[in-house]
Amino acid sequence: MQVSLITCTSNSEETLEDCCNSICAQTYGNLEHIIIDNNSNDNTLNILNKSKINNQRIFQQKSKGIYGALNEGMKMSNGKIIGILHSDDELIDKEIIEIISKKFLENNLDVLFSNIFYTKKNNINKITRKWTSNLNEGIQQNNDLIQRINNGWMPPHTSLFFKKNLLNEIGYYDESFKISSDYDFIIRLFKQNNLKIFFLNKFSVKMRSGGISNKSFSNIFKKMREDIIIMKKFKLNAFITILIKNLSKIKQFF
């Protein structure tokens, strides 16, 4: 079963080599790496061309935003399973994709999510926060997950792996949302009936701080506005929870 990892790059030379090395080190052989590059003019392409990833495909295009680029990557992918790995993030160890693939095969899964580490922007080995689901490992009940989402819970999209054919049912990232499209996407995904969704109680990714959603005060408030639109769309009642979660990000600036 082929797994496709989608990475978007835009002058990503500072962190890209570590990202690629974490993919190259994987013990799982049937792995595809799709890169959507925003016409980088630094050393990004040299790093990609020198990487030792066996099945890597690079597509250059003028920026359509992060979600437009991810959509292009998913459309270009050949894998049965899709995951997202940003250019400043790393897979946790060399066996994680093999473990994830095995879970899909053993349990005939549609979706899998796991735990992730958040790290300092300039030191990915310095853990600043841990996201854990507080669930027991195994197949989850859709209704239970939707209830959690209704209370403000949401797994990070970088921890998520899903079958590509689900895109035919739920669609791709909504590009009208510039910051919170992953929130909208995951709700649509988890609201599908009769999916086999598995929680892997293992850390899968180290994710650097400083992403688009929390790089500035302005983006934090833009994200809150988009979150509210999405909550109204799905008739969720998590306004206070989302407000607190977004406002809590402000402390990183002090």
List where the protein language model places each region:
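Short beta-strand/loop segment that forms part of the nucleotide-sugar
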Residues: L31-N39, F59-K62
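Short aromatic/hydrophobic "clamp" motif used to bind/position activated sugar donors
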Residues: I82
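Conserved donor NDP-sugar-binding/catalytic core segment of glycosyltransferases
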Residues: K94-K130
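Conserved nucleotide-sugar donor-binding catalytic segment
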Residues: N136-K222
